[in-house]
Regions:
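Asp-box/WD-like beta-propeller blade repeats and closely related beta-sheet repeat scaffolds
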Residues: 123-212, 216-217
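Residue-level detector of Asp-centered blade-edge/turn motifs that repeat once per structural unit
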Residues: 45-47, 102-103, 153-155, 216-218
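Short, solvent-exposed loop/turn segments at conserved positions within beta-propeller repeat blades
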Residues: 61-64, 112-115, 166-172
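Bacterial N-terminal signal peptides
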Residues: 15-27
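Beta-strand-rich domains and repeat architectures in extracellular enzymes and scaffolds
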Residues: 33-73, 80-105, 109-112
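A short loop-to-beta-strand structural motif that recurs across blades of beta-propeller domains
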Residues: 67-69, 116-118, 174-176
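Blade-loop segments of beta-propeller domains
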Residues: 80-150
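Bacterial N-terminal signal peptides that target proteins for export
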Residues: 2-18
Length: 219
């Protein structure tokens, strides 16, 4: 059973009305788009069955909660183009980016306002994902990183970028490692001119700021 997800960094699908319209442009069908994926992830080739959309809760609309929405995108299915499942996570967390683990069995989705990370099992029953864990101690476990932004798959682990810190709430932040099942591993603070932390400086400044992450594999 194959599946794919779209996130704001790679696709404009941000809200329910938007992505329902977007489903109609999957012509003739939804195919895997690997352009934003980690090279450590198992590759998907061919027809997708489902699209997972991590959506923002809106006060006064439905239950008002952030939720993971599953859409059937297989043209051979009787539910093609329809929402087949929704899963609310409780409250509004400023739903933002999401990403698969390297084995694509779990989808990690972050909330910027609450610094929570939600881990969904999308492998056992791809049509009906299950919320299997909520990381609600991200700030404490990471040593002060705030706002989990980008999720990036490593072999057996997930790397999370943070937008800020809980000391001065500025841009200095870190990369935070977890195991695929959500156990904290390590925090790697971004290099500064005062402390490069073993990094090789290639630009003019090292200011400790952090936003996104990509890997340049060397083969």
């Amino acid at each position: 059973m194959k599946h794919v997800f779209y996130r704001p960094g790679c696709s404009p699908l941000r809200a329910l009305g938007t992505f329902l319209t977007a489903v109609s442009v999957f012509s003739p069908a939804a195919w895997a788009d690997e352009t934003c994926q980690s090279p450590y992830m198992a590759k998907i080739i061919g027809q997708e069955d489902f699209v997972y959309v991590w959506t923002l809760g809106v006060e006064g609309l439905g239950d008002g909660q952030d939720k993971l929405v599953t859409i059937d995108v297989n043209p051979g299915s009787p539910n093609y183009g329809k929402i087949v499942h929704t899963l609310s996570v409780g409250g509004r967390n400023e739903a933002h980016h999401s990403g698969f683990t390297d084995d694509r069995k779990y989808l990690w989705a972050g909330g910027l306002d609450t610094s929570k990370i939600f881990i969904f099992d999308v492998h056992t029953d791809p049509a009906q994902p299950k919320l299997v864990k909520t990381i609600d101690r991200f700030v404490a476990e990471s040593g002060g990183v705030v706002g989990p932004h980008t999720t990036y798959a490593l072999p057996g682990r997930m790397m999370i970028t943070g937008l800020s810190n809980n000391k001065d709430h500025g841009g200095r932040s870190a990369l935070v490692e977890y195991t695929n099942d959500g156990k904290y591993v390590a925090t790697h603070w971004m290099p500064t001119d005062e402390n490069l932390r073993g990094a090789k400086k290639s630009g003019k400044y090292a200011d400790g700021y952090n936003y996104d992450v990509r890997v340049l594999p060397r083969r």
